[in-house]
Amino acid sequence: MNRSLSKRAIGLGLSLGAMLTCQFAAAADGIGGAGSSAAAPVYRTWAQEYRKAGGEALEYDPVGSGAGLARIKQRQTDFGAVDVMVPRNELARDGLVMFPTAVSGIVPVVNLRKGGAPLKLSGEVLARIFLGEISHWQAPEIVALNPGVALPNEAIRVVCRSDGSGSTHHFSDYLSKVSPAWKARFGVVGR
């Protein structure tokens, strides 16, 4: 696909998304969107390319899937981006249409402050870390998965989101599938 055609396709996709998602323009000037922080880089790139191609300004606020969904339901924005499917009856009730625009992945990130081999964690070990059952990098379960890797004698500091997030939903869904203890205690959360 050549660059000009690509720009037109991006513009058309954004325009259709805005028109189908909301029956009126919430933004006074240009197109406004809000939602998934994971998808923000894609929307920023599309907005820049669409503007270069002569389209309207597009502003995207990466407030998280939950807040984006709330804003589109309250007609505070032209489109909302979420990482989790919204039930059909909810879409119908609120006069919304949903279609996929991007795909993203979730990867735990660690900072051991030492170079070396990549760290390996199983789903069960990851769940136990987030449950607080494994609290140090030199825990036998982590050492067993990483033979020969020099692990620090330090506590694991877990950082996570607290808002309604599609990433939280998908991550907790995964942990629920690999850990009966996680499923029983928390289950799938976020959206």
List the model feature ranges, each with a label.
Residues 26-191:
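Flexible loop/hinge segments at secondary-structure junctions
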